[in-house]
Amino acid sequence: MSRSSLLLVFFTLFGLAAAQFQFFNDFFGGQQHHQQQQRTGASQYAAFSENVPCSHYLCPGTMDCVERPRDCPCPDVQDVKCLIPDMDSDDDEATVVCVRGGTDCSTVEKLMKRGS
């Protein structure tokens, strides 16, 4: 077989393999497509949240309607909800942290003491 025939066979097989396994799509354009899907998900969330009747605060993880953000439940039932008081706020505002693998918030409290 001549060199040009081998090159022709090689490029033909490579073209078939690339088409079959979407090599070029994943290698050159896969990230752009993935980012576009994330924007679509965010717009779907926005559209869904506008249709949920809630006059207070709509929890993003559970879509529960609560009085204030600190009242949101954790998305998973096995999580423990820990409240971290906001130091800058005069009222009882807090940041919610959901912890998995324990039965209480002692680890979060230890980390808070270390950070202050």
From Swiss-Prot:
<comment type="similarity">
    <text>Belongs to the LCL2 family.</text>
</comment>
<protein>
    <recommendedName>
        <fullName>Long chronological lifespan protein 2</fullName>
    </recommendedName>
</protein>
<dbReference type="GO" id="GO:0036503">
    <property type="term" value="P:ERAD pathway"/>
</dbReference>
<feature type="signal peptide">
    <location>
        <begin position="1"/>
        <end position="19"/>
    </location>
</feature>
<keyword id="KW-0732">Signal</keyword>
<comment type="function">
    <text>Probable component of the endoplasmic reticulum-associated degradation (ERAD) pathway.</text>
</comment>
<dbReference type="InterPro" id="IPR034543">
    <property type="entry name" value="LCL2"/>
</dbReference>
